[in-house]
């Protein structure tokens, strides 16, 4: 079943072992399962939606000479069905990778000697080629200009594809009928513009010195319009057979999940081992199908180095707990204990020395290999002067950025043995080497460059592999604040981002988790040219952006007050809640919706917890639970009885009350009052004010609904 998680993709067997995964993991699992029984299959991917801040992956399967699509682990009655079918009709790019020297009719997006990346958007949505022509200020064509076709998503302009202009200064991309930002870079020259693909066939970019002066630019970006829904009507008998299969599949998964360790067993084990029961249960419950490995690690760790057990487990992510092997964790615990460490801050030590995770790779055993192969002389000298570790890596590890074509990092053990690595794998190896020496090390969270702390300090120093790649020594303080109280929780990567101009392009700073809920916020960053982007996503999927270009001088402090644009159009009520709207709670008690709305307002929600769009809403309600409970607006949720079991693990706002809507009677009555608006896509959410007016309708797949309702 679906559960959102971090960016690391679990293996197919780990996904099966834990009975859950996000869309990328579910699609990798399904493709692997189909291929395992001889059925051709491939993963297709939308790198970013135009109408909401998210991406998605699903599966295509080859049947009788053609490709059909299906949801990864979300069965439908037939092929070419799925909740994502309608969102995909509004996509700007859908692509897949084909192994080998594939030659076909699809547009080629990327190629290497081992694979081709192809554009399959036209299988799902209306598409057309958008031509970009790069010229000088006098109109002369410029060849070999890098052109980036970018889509607003997650608070930044994400590059869907990059092209090089030909001798006529032209390049193109087959894309959807929405808006894109087009950027061109040619040495010290550049240009950018908004492209309205539905209205333009060609855009012309005139290259000029770039970046220019400080300025603010406001632009609106619209996704492809919503088209009338395709008819997916299936015979009643077929649908009933499908529901029977779903119930059987759910029972199989539930029976398997029942084999996971339970709280009573964990409590007994905690007593036997003299461990805190709550702490033990926190880790064992999170480990799901991997509980035997985590249990074995805990048991064996107690025999070796009990004091490091909890610190190591606490730095692991939930996904690590679900697929890390006991032997891997023991390798790090036992060999970290052998290392003399000068660090006195236990939390700092756990995060940057003990931690087996380097970035988002699968955890592996590397500490014992490095600890046992580093000579005492090197260990002693490098601990005193970590630049000796930098010099050792520079001298002994050859960098090859061509042959690791899938960009999956090599393990540090593999780099040690091969003495060859791509740039990222080299950087991760250096971090592993430092931690094996007992030195704190990490990837800089802003620019993802390797850093270390000299022994006994908390002063991060960036590694310089080559003189020309040195980060600017001069830094400055950026004082960020929000001047818009209507944005309740300005979140980085949702409402705003920052990018620094380097290597002829704006590179988004990696500041995940940053929030301006309590501002101002001081950031220490290198001086240079910056771009701040704010975006306000509208209910129709369009976004109002503000781009702030500015220079940050060295050794100074610059206040930056972020602001968000708002529509000047005030929408009236869409309809009224029908009179005498009554439903029944799960306890059988009658609920008068008109009275409820008149008292405190009301949210009505038709949800399918088995589908990803509804699961996003439920997850947002959990994250925003304090805000919702403080608001105290009643929420009536209509969920099929067979799906209510899925809510038991959710910590939802206390005012959410489940109810039944037999034969969708209330749903149909409300739909009849809305005229041309059909409530067909999962989920459906209505916000009703105290005058019983329906003031907001949300339906279908969209991120950020939880905040929008507030």
List each model region and its residues:
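Short, internal strand/loop/helix patches
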Residues: 636, 648-682
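A short, hydrophobic beta-strand/beta-hairpin element that forms part of a small beta-sheet core
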Residues: 681-699
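Hydrophobic/aromatic-rich core segments of domains that either
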Residues: 1-14, 18-111, 181-183, 376-381, ...
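Short Pro-Gly-centered beta-turn/loop motif in secreted/extracellular proteins
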Residues: 64, 167-189, 195-202, 514-543, ...
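Short, acidic Ser/Thr/Gly-rich low-complexity loop/linker segments typical of extracellular
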Residues: 153-175, 502-519
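A short, amphipathic beta-strand motif
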Residues: 128-139, 169, 474-488
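Secondary-structure boundary elements
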Residues: 1-18, 237-418
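Short active-site neighborhood of thiol/selenol oxidoreductases, capturing the structured segment around
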Residues: 593-617, 621, 634-636
